[in-house]
Amino acid sequence: MKILVIGSNGQLGRSLLTSLARPYPGTIFWDRQALDLTKLGVIRARLENLGPQVIINASAYTAVDQAEQETALALAVNRDAVGEIASYCAAVDAVLIHVSTDYVFDGAASAPYVETADTNPQGVYGASKLAGEQAIAASGCRHLILRTAWVFSPYGQNFLKTMLRLGGERDTLSVVADQIGSPTFAGDLAEAIVATLKPVREGDCAWGLYHYAGDASVSWYEFACEIFAQAQHMGFSVPDTVNAISTSEYPTPAPRPAWSALDSSKFTGVFGQPSSDWRAGITTCLQALGQLSK
C-alpha cells in the first residue's frame, strides 16, 4: 500500500513521520517544495506520476486572522487544492484521509459537537475548510475526514510553544477564558490516523466524517495554567501571574467560536483509538522541548 503524506513539515506531518515509521516504513512524505498546493495546475500530474493508493493530507492554510485578508489564497489551498487531490483519488480509487477543523462551527453549542451538528463557520478560514470537506464529498472518492481542534506539539507554531515563549519573557500574562475547546496533542492525532490504516488496507473501513480531539472541554486560560504548572515542575521559566480575560478584551481580526469542543466518541467506537489525553500530551511536549534545549 503506497502511502503519501502531504504537508510533512507541519505539526501533524512531523508527528506522522514518527508514527508511521515502524508500521508503514515506505511512506512517502512531501513538503511544500515537493508539492505546492497553491499551484493547482500541477497537483493532478504530480499525483498521477507517483500513484499513491492512500493520501494523508496534513497540509492546510491555517493563518486564521490573515485569511480575512487572503481569502483567495485560503480557498485555493483549503478548497481548490483539496478538490484536486480528491478528484485524483476518485479517478484511481485511492483513499483520501483529510484533516479539518473545529472552526467549521459557530460556537453556539454548550456540549461537544458531534459529526451531525450543523456547520456555520464565522470566518474565512473555517469557511475554506468546510468548502474543502464539501469538495471531498462531492468527488465521490473513498475518504475519511477528521475534524480536530487546538493542535499542539513540540513542532512549529502553536499555543503551547507561544505560552512557553511568553512565559519566559513576562512576569504577567493574560489569557482568554471564555473560549472553550478540546486541546489535541499532534502525536495522538497521528496515532489516530495510523489506527485507520488497517481497515483501509483491508477494505473494511467505515468511510466518512469523524471528530478526533482532546478528551476535555477547557478554556485557553485553563490550557495555559496546565502548561505552566507542568512547565514549572520541569524547570521552565513561567510567569508569576496568569490572568483570565474575556474575548472582548483580546480582539482579533477573525472571530473565534466561543465553544468548539469536539466529541470523539464515534471515532473511538469505530477505530478503537481513545481521544487525545491533553494533559499527557503537554507532558510529552515539554519533555521533548526540554531535550531540544539541552
Locations of the language-model features?
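NAD(P)H-binding glycine-rich loop region in Rossmannoid oxidoreductase-like domains
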Residues: 40-79
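NAD(P)-cofactor binding segment of oxidoreductase domains
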Residues: 69-97
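Catalytic helix-loop patch of NAD(P)-dependent Rossmann-fold dehydrogenases
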Residues: 76, 81-84, 104-146, 150-152
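NAD(P)-dependent short-chain dehydrogenase/reductase
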Residues: 134-181, 187-195
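Substrate-binding strand-loop-helix patch
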Residues: 154, 179-190, 210-230, 284
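Mid/C-terminal beta-alpha module of Rossmann-like enzyme folds, strongest
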Residues: 199-251
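Amphipathic terminal alpha-helices
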Residues: 277-294
